Amino acid sequence: MSTVEKCFMLLLVLLTTALQGQTTEPKRSERYAKAYEKYLGASCPVPKDSIQHFVYFARDRELIKDHPLLSHPMFKGAQIMYSWRELEPEKGKYDFTILREDMEYLKSYRKRLFIQLQDVTFNIKYKAVPDYLLTEEYDGGVVMQYNDDDSPGGWVAQRWNKTVRAQFSLLLQALGKEFDGKIEGINLQETSIGVRDSVFSELEYVVALKENMLSLKKSFPTSTTMIYANFIPGEWLPGDDKGYLRGIYQYGEQIGVGLGGPDLMVKRKGQLNHALAMMHEGQYTVPLGIAVQDGNYIGETGDIDNEKKNSTHHSIVPLLHAFAKDFLKINYMFWVDQEPYFKTDVLTCFSRE
């Protein structure tokens, strides 16, 4: 074989390998696309099992009063979002009054409180951090985050800023001192953010998340701790895997912080290739959690317009439960109190036995 022929054969092999790689990657990204089909036969009633079910209230805590969850045997309690701003009205001065009220109210019905600590918002009119952080000393404390269409989407606490993070750690310590062992658990908000800060670093952000996780665990050695780890800026799985999200899951398992995610979307590729894949593929001793949030009851995310809210739909609650239990091996499920779906789909499907 001549030199020219050898070169041609080598080029052909390289081209074939490259083409195989191109066809393999799409298949990897589709590997769980039909996983939900196994659970299409799931039906009501959803029986009592090992999953701890909580009803989620997104900063509308007053709705727990006389709520149906209080008398329902399937629900262990309420997950309520509290903003950093509410809990620390002034620097170093904490006010946990609403936490105590909610904890005691739930306790009177033999239910438990699960705290979600808010430092990120999806509303440009509201910042979840105390006013003192919005100063030059903390570089403004927050930055704008943007939606996929480049429109402003809310505000993100500068988790990657050491001075901001130090204050967050002090808040966790104060919370843990009073509530560790008294509440069911506490979780940090999702890791997914859409920022354009000139000083933002992907690597520093991952380090910051891990530091917050460690602070959380040290502050709450007894109650369940959890972080909603769904996406990390700068990588997109499975093709562009820089180890960011994977590292968060490994670290959580290492230090004893539970791992979870918002938005149980069983048909959405993004969710299937990130948080849901991490849960399905890993072996964990820490608790796993998944949230059914606004829109998820009809396969959407975020706020749903009135037309969709009022349209006829088929309940997917049995499917979501079966998928979470078998495919994800979940320990905690957080069902948002979204009308009309919580009453029409969840309450009617959950067994009272």
Question: Where do the PLM segments sit?
Answer:
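Hydrophobic h-region of N-terminal signal peptides that target proteins for export
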Residues: 12-21
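Bacterial N-terminal signal peptides that target proteins for export
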Residues: 1-8
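Acidic (Asp/Glu)-rich catalytic clusters
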Residues: 67-74, 101-109, 179, 216-218, ...
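Aromatic-lined carbohydrate-binding surfaces of glycoside hydrolases
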Residues: 44-207, 214-216, 222-241, 257-259, ...
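Mature N-terminal, pre-catalytic/accessory segment of carbohydrate-active enzymes
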Residues: 22-53
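Substrate-binding cleft of secreted/luminal carbohydrate-active enzymes
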Residues: 29, 114, 118, 255-353
